Regions:
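Hydrophobic alpha-helical transmembrane segments of membrane transport/permease proteins
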Residues: 18-69, 162-183
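Membrane-water interface segments at the C-terminal ends of transmembrane alpha-helices
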Residues: 25-32, 62, 70-73, 137-167, ...
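An internal, D/E-rich "acidic patch" concept
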Residues: 1-4, 61-117
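Charged, compositionally biased N-terminal leader segments and the immediate start
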Residues: 1-29
């Protein structure tokens, strides 16, 4: 147990260092963008006195390092200031949008994870068959297709031509859970098509590799039924790489959802980021980017911990 806690602590410490470095990059990349924030807020007709007063109010008259430390302190307390465009709290705005993104990611994961594992095992058992070749072509096509392309294809056939689902994933207060699932089905399906292909191929490769192991051959020679060979002998040793790839794809579901949210006009954090960039709402841009980075690092940490817990060789590296 001590070895596991030590490894987790090292991963956590490394993640915090990486997040700190990313926070520096995010802040100063925004600082380097052309234009004057005060001018953007007040407009071209603002007087020099009003511009100077707003710069003092926003702390723009202070050195960049001082402003970074102030912003970082607020970020640690989940206080990202106020939106330049709306004046609303960035934390509240981003919090609502992030909750919507988490729901969409969870919706897609609930479908993609079991489907990809089951299909990966079936394809591995039917290696080199027609089913395997068809699955290989379909997954490669899905992986190579951009998310926005898949999204527009689904909109064309499932929304425009058939009218089965709405083309825009609009949400409203008081919506019941069934309607919520219905309205967000197309963006969730778009994400499912992308991540299922990745996870299915990894599961297939892992199972095929394990089926060639000596202990699997021994189990077969003993007359163990094929399903029992998979469930009792192959899957327990396949969980480490499978859990790792699942966690990494969950990270993608949250951080790579921007294009999907834009295509379906879904009110998530990705859509908020795009809107903020177009309106030069820098506090929202900084907050959204930092949340994306923190989420990705956290899920990578979860992948590392899952791999450690399911692989004895990682638990006892010596």
């Amino acid at each position: 147990m001590g070895d596991i806690l030590g490894l987790v602590a090292k991963r956590l410490g490394l993640g915090l260092v990486i997040l700190l470095i990313i926070s520096v990059i995010i802040f100063f990349m925004v600082e380097l963008l052309p234009g004057d924030i005060a001018q953007a807020v007040l407009g071209q007709g603002a007087t020099p006195e009003n511009l100077a007063a707003l710069r003092r109010e926003m702390g723009l008259d202070q050195p960049a390092i001082v402003r970074y430390l102030t912003w970082l302190k607020g970020a640690v307390m989940l206080d990202f200031g106020n939106s330049i465009v709306t004046g609303a709290s960035v934390s509240q705005t981003i919090g609502t949008r992030f909750a919507n993104t988490l729901f969409l990611a969870a919706y897609a994961a609930a479908i993609a994870v079991p489907v990809s594992i089951i299909l990966g095992v079936l394809v591995a058992l039917a290696r080199n068959s027609i089913f395997d070749r068809v699955a290989n072509v379909v997954t490669l096509t899905s992986i190579s297709s951009p998310e926005f392309f898949l999204g527009y294809i689904l909109i064309l056939y499932l929304a425009v031509k058939t009218g089965m689902f709405p083309a825009i994933a609009s949400l409203r207060e008081g919506m019941d859970f069934g309607e919520l699932l219905y309205r967000t089905f197309l963006p969730a399906l778009t994400l499912v098509l992308v991540v299922t292909a990745h996870m299915m191929r990894m599961t297939r490769a892992t199972i095929i590799n394990l089926l060639a192991s000596p202990y699997i051959e021994m189990a077969r020679l003993k007359g163990t039924p094929p399903w029992k060979v998979i469930v009792k002998h192959a899957l327990p040793n396949a969980w480490a790489p499978i859990i790792n790839v699942v966690a990494l794809n969950l990270a993608y579901l949250i951080t790579g959802v921007v294009l999907v949210e834009v295509v379906f006009v879904y009110p998530g954090i990705g859509q908020a980021l795009v809107d903020a960039v177009s309106k030069r709402d820098f506090p929202v841009v900084q907050a959204a980017c930092l949340i994306f980075a923190a989420t990705f690092i956290l899920l990578n940490l979860a992948a590392d911990v899952g791999a450690i817990l399911t692989n004895p060789r990682l638990r006892h590296p010596k």
